[in-house]
């Protein structure tokens, strides 16, 4: 205790260190508090478009995690290096294990200073929650946990790095190492990881995960549905650096001691670091706003992975047990209506690793797998009525973990009969994949939170008949409107009342195709070119409201034709350079042909012709073939006028 008092006295008398602490504490409190006042006085402002504002307030506060890391690394390094040179502490360094005790005392004092500097940020979150009357009761605990992890544990890891650096290298080298750690830990090195994979196919995603000790608010806005990722493996990454730093410091302090002393000092910290390392890099699901390397679907998929094979059987029912923990763990029993087939092709997202495939008696079934495509062979009796699969894994886009879940019914997180394209490389987005006909579902959910679905729920079990079972949780609530269940994020840019107004404005439920369906407002993903809104037999999922009518039309269009729909939607944007666009001769003929058709028929007639083609399932032509053939049938004078850029 005497040593702690002496060490604290030494810290408090150091003007440089105290000035840094006071400036950081006062400025961060004033700036974050001022932003909170701005949000409260402008709550509900359509210009801001941030809805409740709670997540944005938290996001702003967490931006100080990088500043806190740098400030306390500097404070820690200067304190560790100056204290051991202080004449008043020479008596402790001369005693047995004195230097080790001194460093532990310094660490304890610095950790206490970090904690004291964090308390105002926690209080600000509590005050904002109370004054703002935030609609989600559990949010305050989440916000305080984020403050603790990113504004206390992250700077504390910086203090530990500073401790190791003060023993390991001279001042300039130490500061360079600490600066490098801060930059890599902030997430700004993402471009480096992406370049490494694009150029050399070096996957650094696990290295990146180990360095992700700060919130994504440094680069991205928070997800209204998920908030910020606050998972065990991220906390383990922070403790990895703490444990590793202590192991390095312990080794340097006792390197001249006998082996037993060195082992006793280094081994516990080293084992803790290894345990945290393993926990960090093991596969885990999270909500990611940027993914690089082989785990990114944009990098994984190529055009030769796109397959379409109709199944000769139908799934008549599913009995599923889904556990959301570190990742999705699933046990699925799929009843099939054709028991005598030789093989049963199905689609299951490649990120889910299969543990076993059996029949209804538990006998193993032979199977082959190629990415998303799984083929299960019939049992020896040739009469297969049920296929049971056990698998575990995750998607880098559609998360399913102990914090929240987002599994739209259009995504094959459950086995779907036949081979279907999961991800379109042409349009950089996920396709709509559902069952050919509705099946009876029973889904038992094991999760530490409430889950919403288009199926009926009773005691954690969802059941009902559907072609696409959607599962969604997070900062979610629901209400009834015109016989439909509306599921939305309480932190979305629109409030409950504003959602009702917007739905009424566009007469959403006046459309007979949408009337009575459950509506799920869903998170945006990195690849939402094709999944802005999907309409199913009993529900629809959408990232917004105004886009639903257009998306309802778009999803009826086959992928091979969607390019024409994109051009028509943005015709004014593309029209100016139709005739000057670069590309192959076919591309140029396509753009020139579309321009000629618009000039000859007029915009309204062109859209009518194109709409008929887009919705005609029997017409197997691509959009390019359709436009070139139709333009080729125009009078030669009209074609020539179009090529010359002349209107009618």
Give short role names for the model-derived ranges.
Residues 343-364, 416, 440-452:
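Solvent-exposed beta-hairpin/edge-strand motifs
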Residues 477-571, 575-577, 581-582:
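Juxtacatalytic substrate-recognition/specificity segment
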Residues 392-467:
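Extended, low-hydrophobicity, Ser/Thr/Pro/Gly-biased non-transmembrane segments
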Residues 137-138, 193-240, 259-327:
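N-terminal, polar/Ser/Thr-rich
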Residues 75-115:
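Helix-loop-helix units of permease transmembrane domains in multi-pass membrane transporters
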Residues 44-68, 78, 104-171:
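Secretory targeting signals
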Residues 350-406, 505:
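A surface-exposed beta-strand-loop module
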